[in-house]
Amino acid sequence: MGSSGFSWTLPDHPKLPKGKSVAVVVLDGWGEANPDQYNCIHVAQTPVMDSLKNGAPEKWRLVKAHGTAVGLPSDDDMGNSEVGHNALGAGRIFAQGAKLVDQALASGKIYDGDGFNYIKESFESGTLHLIGLLSDGGVHSRLDQLQLLLKGVSERGAKKIRVHILTDGRDVLDGSSIGFVETLENDLLELRAKGVDAQIASGGGRMYVTMDRYENDWDVVKRGWDAQVLGEAPYKFKSALEAVKTLRAQPKANDQYLPPFVIVDDSGNAVGPVLDGDAVVTINFRADRMVMLAKALEYADFDNFDRVRVPKIRYAGMLQYDGELKLPSRYLVSPPEIDRTSGEYLVKNGIRTFACSETVKFGHVTFFWNGNRSGYFDATKEEYVEVPSDSGITFNVAPNMKALEIAEKARDALLSGKFDQVRVNLPNGDMVGHTGDIEATVVACKAADEAVKIILDAVEQVGGIYLVTADHGNAEDMVKRNKSGKPLLDKNDRIQILTSHTLQPVPVAIGGPGLHPGVKFRNDIQTPGLANVAATVMNLHGFEAPADYEQTLIEVADN
């Protein structure tokens, strides 16, 4: 903060002592919903979480993890791991990706910035390529934003536009890709009627083409590069609608894993490879699954796969995807400026911190928790440990994931006496839940519960405190439902599996031998959310939170 009166020093809490080890456990994708056969958390054997829920009602609360509570535009917007961990770590609610883009599009500000002026220089003689997820899921992108952007760029001089689509089926229903393609094709038809050469150029399923994250599998990005940039793919079609319908008809096909395809003209030539002088915009507002493509598009020194041909382009992201790497260096909408996170405060007040997860969620307990900031605040007081995730398989094949390894590292960190806070993310409920495999998700929830036990046992041994929470829902509801709550059926009378996050609240549980006996959850916060957790954790460490943080969830009763 710029004011001369600012201090990083946190005041002592008047009633809570310092010096207790605090374990912060985030169960990814672990919401609270009605118990039925499609609630994998309910079906699974989860004795530890059950005991927290049923043990002491004053030590268990549900908080909001979606919509306005995490900075998203409306309460119809599902939470996600990025905004969830931002809120958990920042202690305040910041306007997030989708909301920032909405504001910039509505005001026209998106067209005034350096990023747009940079790509605009290619409009006269080059092609504008838009690459991203074609979906209204609102987690990575939104169709209406693409529609507004197409209108805006065409009104501001873009003469030739190529859209490279990635089908969803993860944050929206499988099969919805066909409707999204039809909508986009109609919009492009209207642009062509106005003299703009606009069409879909390539496509593929999000989990198989382009949208890998945390450098788990560069082949995913390469398949996208080949189709989008080189105009080469194993499947060639005259239209995207034909492509999606044909590829979905293959055995076991689904939107998430459609193979890459390119659209070709009557001569069999790809209609939209990226060439020298073109402009490229990656339209997703969520960062994690765009970073790898951004590196391939922007870095001159790049050896993760053979790009074959590296066109001289003007590239901008919808947002900047990594603030520490300054990637991409150009972007259409500035990211939220998250300052004074709880992690930075606590480290500056002497709290030695250990953070751990496996690859798929490691960035969440570090980068996103710390306000979209890479690296340490103070390397002498922090240690971040990444357990490598399984690669080359879908997570339902090995639903235990690395929960045991994460828990053991957390246990060892607690028992070592070197750390005041041990923070972990257990990804099972979310990552396996996304596969839509109910049986595997039940196993995943059991594994996460067993991991929590290992950590809480260590808390018990060191006389510490625990706070167990989640970042959003997923595993607690695996089916699409009608307004009355009954599962929806498809045309073959089979339940429609839900692979996305949910709008459900998530738990916050506190306890441990080090917890002051008078601590209990307050009842005077009207709509508690994830952002209230940061002040709560600060209290557990014996500090008062900054005045502008969302209120703590706890109070101390006088005995």
From Swiss-Prot:
Localization per record: Cytoplasm
Annotated pathway: Carbohydrate degradation; glycolysis; pyruvate from D-glyceraldehyde 3-phosphate: step 3/5
Annotated Gene Ontology cellular component terms: cytoplasm
Domain of life: Eukaryota
Post-translational modification: The N-terminus is blocked.
Recorded family membership: Belongs to the BPG-independent phosphoglycerate mutase family.
EC number in record: 5.4.2.12
Species whose genome carries this gene: Zea mays
Reported function: Catalyzes the interconversion of 2-phosphoglycerate and 3-phosphoglycerate.
Cysteine pairings via disulfide bonds: none
Annotated active site: 81
The record's free-text note on cofactor binding: Binds 2 manganese ions per subunit.
Binding site for substrate: 140, 170-171, 206, 213, 286-289, 361
UniProt-annotated binding residues for Mn(2+) 2: 28, 81, 471-472
Subunit structure: Monomer.
Keywords recorded for this protein, A-Z: Cytoplasm, Glycolysis, Isomerase, Manganese, Metal-binding
Protein name: 2,3-bisphosphoglycerate-independent phosphoglycerate mutase
Catalyzed reactions per annotation: (2R)-2-phosphoglycerate = (2R)-3-phosphoglycerate
Tissue and organ expression note: Found ubiquitously in germinating seed.
Cofactor entry: Mn(2+)
